[in-house]
């Protein structure tokens, strides 16, 4: 029999696909479209890993599945090529990031083609190509024109190793997400996108998304909407208070409210110096006995007294070294008194102002009113520093504050002090005023430089490119209204990579358009993306792309407000011991090693779909890879056997030396059991009686098996239950080995197999002389001609019989079949008292 040689087979079909371009997508009037994409990869020097394969293969299975149903499918491909790894490699080796990235892209493309993916290679994009980042800069300018791209000075996470700022979501457990080094806080002027402008719409639209619940929950929590009130607490000094005796007790009260005769002149800052706090419980204001400020609070330097300044500055420096996670842990509270006081507007009493790191600058205003009687953290703080705890009743807050809604989400920090990124299209005049680069001067190209190391001041290497820095742009004179050309200095920060990935799904529709970021006709036909597949970026990329979509819809550039209809979020492929794969651990599985070991791409693809439920992590199992190879080998043997016997038109079983692959009902794994010398499963097994019953089965039963399999695989792919779809195909092949397979059986097998193993399936379809259109099932064939009847003796299971469905109405015939069974005879030698047959349960009980 002809041998299954996957590498030779795959080389043949990949050459055909390269030449014929069967996956080129074009707009077709009246044909339903399907736009499927994966989160595009960063092309590292290490090349593809098996995690990429899972991601890409999910997309490919769906692409081929819908193409076989004759939808107009677009599956593009791209590379997220800007970023720190390429630049750090350039600093280390002296090689240009541009050259290194080009090599990596070439390698990734070659590897993707080895896996046989149905990609339209004419729709390939690269975020570091000028043709692409010209339009990233255009996107920035649209946001800038509407006031949604702006600069401000604030404390930012700073990685001292990579020498760049990091967004909140790029700090993991207090460390840089790239290099793993501990981060610190640094005050810098940075560029931001005002994503908070769309906070409500981003939140309100989440529930309607066809996305995994855990991703929707993560986005809700990241946005973090809180409804409450803002309350002003005036800052005052000692001269603003008088002592008042009430029933023998003394309290300090604001002089303003008791009159100048009792308190003297008001402090000069009384009316214009205040601390505004946000609280979700304004009704507890009577219990507020002190205020607490975050160490980063912007007005702290103006509040602290001279006596407390040294202690406050020392505490702030220590606090800024901690991550937000560390500051929120249930450790002993720390803090320092500012030496300043405020007035509780409800009680009119003097309360101290403290600084503590359990208050975060990113929440509310960065200041809280502490109500130790109602809040556990405030109570712990009060007890440690001997601050008053006042039990209080709840009240109406209207006279003291104003309703306010705040969000945990901050505006999106998008500037980076690195060379290898998209240049920000801004230049500064001699007075430091920012001006946009005119659109007709885009793209602002990255200059060729020799030294990629950022300087110690925090500026990127672009600051060293003196010729590049100077640019003349038209600027309108504020006084005369006239426009004149002036010399400016370019911005030396570059855009965060997330800016490049926030719009690439729209660039795919017209990747070579020189006049538009995305062509209007193409975006109207293809977008939004129907299915998007990935395993990362739940609250970064997936939130940013929604923000940009809503913004550009408001500007009239997009006809929809949500960019992605359905999101598939899959688990990781881990090492065999269950640990995460990493180069440092030396446990990375190279997919090309698996292919070149003789298993081929089809085996690798099918195994990764069979490895487990798509949404869960899975451990790599080399033994199961071999099991999947044997399954595909059996498919090929069925084909060869059928072709060899096609002239006779007979059904033929394969040689008895082959291996039966059975799916365990308890675990999603392959197990092996050898056929006995007669070509049947071992005696006494359920499979043996089943095989005997179907050795020469009626056409109705064969049709039932075939249509049942079509229905199962179709529905499983729709539900992204790829592992059970592959299992159903394995079961179908087992049945064909028992019964023998004719052409119709193999046609169905090849068509169902193609999304998973396209090379083998294409070979089968070619030899069978049919196209790949997806098969359909008919309901009338889903009811089997045979059913299983359980036989008990005195209530204990003793046998299972396969009987014709029509015989269920003939109780005596079923009893006769049972009594004739060898397994039952040994229990009925002394006679039978009675028999009880329950038709609905398909159960016969024999009482002896």
Task: Locate predicted features.
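A charged helix-plus-loop insertion that forms the helical arch/lid used to bind
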Residues: 89-104
């Amino acid at each position: 029999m002809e041998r299954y040689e996957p590498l030779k087979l795959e080389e043949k079909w990949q050459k055909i696909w390269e030449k014929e371009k069967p996956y080129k997508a074009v707009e077709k009037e009246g044909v339903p479209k399907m736009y499927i994409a994966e989160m595009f990869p960063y092309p590292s020097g290490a090349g593809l890993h098996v995690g990429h394969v899972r991601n890409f293969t999910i997309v490919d299975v769906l692409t081929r599945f819908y193409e076989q149903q004759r939808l107009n499918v677009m599956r593009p491909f791209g590379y997220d090529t800007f970023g720190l790894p390429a630049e750090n490699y350039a600093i280390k080796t002296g090689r240009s990031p541009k050259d290194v990235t080009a090599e990596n892209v070439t390698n990734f493309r070659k590897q993707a083609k080895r896996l046989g993916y149905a990609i339209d290679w004419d729709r390939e994009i690269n975020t570091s190509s000028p043709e692409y980042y010209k339009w990233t800069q255009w996107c920035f300018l649209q946001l800038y024109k509407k006031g949604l791209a702006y600069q401000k000075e604030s404390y930012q996470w700073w990685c001292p190793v990579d020498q760049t700022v990091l967004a909140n979501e790029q700090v993991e457990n207090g460390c840089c997400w790239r290099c793993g080094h501990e981060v610190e806080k640094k005050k810098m002027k940075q560029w931001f996108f005002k994503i908070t402008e769309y906070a409500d719409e981003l939140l309100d639209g989440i529930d309607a998304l066809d996305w995994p619940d855990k991703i929707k929950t993560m986005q809700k929590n990241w946005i973090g909407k809180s409804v409450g009130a803002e309350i002003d607490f005036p800052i005052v000094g000692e001269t603003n208070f008088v002592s008042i005796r009430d029933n023998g007790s003394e309290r300090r009260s604001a002089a303003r409210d008791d009159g100048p005769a009792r308190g003297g002149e008001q402090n000069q800052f009384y009316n214009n110096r205040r601390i505004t706090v946000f609280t979700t419980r304004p009704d507890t204001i009577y219990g507020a006995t002190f205020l607490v400020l975050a160490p980063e609070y912007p007005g702290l330097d103006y509040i602290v007294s001279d006596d407390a300044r040294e202690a406050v500055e020392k505490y702030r420096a220590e606090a800024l070294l901690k991550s937000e996670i560390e500051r929120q842990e249930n450790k002993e509270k720390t803090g320092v008194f500012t030496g300043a006081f405020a007035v509780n507007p409800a009680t009119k009493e003097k309360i101290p102002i403290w600084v503590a790191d359990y208050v975060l600058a990113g929440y509310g205003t960065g200041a809280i009113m502490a109500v130790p009687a109602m809040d556990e953290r405030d109570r712990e703080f009060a007890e440690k520093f001997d601050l008053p705890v006042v039990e209080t009743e709840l009240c109406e807050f209207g006279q003291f504050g104003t309703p306010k809604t705040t969000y945990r989400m901050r505006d999106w920090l998008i500037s980076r002090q690195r060379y290898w990124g998209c240049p920000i299209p801004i230049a500064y005049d001699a007075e430091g005023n920012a001006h946009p680069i005119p659109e007709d001067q885009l793209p602002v190209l990255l200059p060729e430089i020799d030294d990629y190391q950022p300087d110690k001041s925090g500026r990127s290497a672009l600051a060293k490119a003196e010729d590049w820095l100077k640019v003349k742009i038209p600027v309108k004179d504020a006084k005369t209204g006239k426009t004149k050309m002036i010399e400016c200095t370019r911005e030396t920060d570059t855009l965060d990579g997330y800016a490049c990935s926030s719009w690439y799904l729209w660039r795919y529709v017209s990747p070579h358009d020189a006049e538009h970021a995305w062509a209007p006709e193409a975006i109207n036909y293809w977008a939004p993306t129907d299915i998007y597949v990935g395993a990362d970026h739940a609250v970064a990329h997936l939130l940013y792309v929604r923000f940009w979509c809503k913004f550009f819809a408001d500007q009239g550039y997009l006809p929809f407000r949500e960019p992605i209809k359905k999101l598939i979020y899959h688990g990781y492929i881990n090492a065999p011991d269950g640990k995460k794969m990493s180069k440092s651990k030396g446990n990375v599985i190279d997919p090309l090693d698996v292919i070149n070991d003789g298993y081929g791409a089809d085996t690798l693809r099918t195994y990764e779909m069979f490895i487990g439920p798509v949404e869960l992590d899975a451990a790599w199992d080399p033994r199961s890879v071999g099991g999947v190879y044997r399954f595909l080998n059996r498919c090929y043997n069925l084909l060869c056997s059928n072709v060899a016997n096609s002239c006779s038109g007979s059904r033929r079983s394969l040689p008895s030396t082959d291996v039966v692959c059975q799916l365990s009902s308890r675990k999603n794994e392959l197990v092996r059991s050898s056929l006995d010398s007669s070509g049947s499963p071992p005696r006494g097994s359920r499979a043996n009686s089943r095989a005997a019953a179907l050795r020469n089965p009626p056409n109705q039963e064969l049709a039932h098996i075939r249509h049942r399999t079509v229905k199962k695989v179709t529905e499983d792919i729709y539900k992204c239950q790829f592992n059970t779809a592959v299992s159903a195909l394995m079961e179908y092949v087992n049945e064909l080995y028992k019964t023998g397979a004719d052409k119709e059986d193999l046609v169905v097998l090849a068509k169902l197999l193609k999304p998973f193993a396209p090379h083998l399936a294409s070979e089968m379809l070619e030899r069978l002389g049919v196209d790949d259109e997806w098969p359909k099932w008919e309901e009338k064939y889903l009811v089997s001609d045979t059913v299983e009847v359980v036989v008990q003796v005195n209530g204990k299971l003793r046998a299972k019989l396969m009987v014709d469905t029509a015989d269920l109405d003939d109780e005596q015939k079923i009893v006769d079949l049972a009594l004739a069974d060898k397994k039952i005879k040994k229990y009925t030698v002394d006679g039978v008292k009675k028999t009880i047959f329950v038709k609905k349960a398909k159960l016969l009980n024999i009482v002896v």
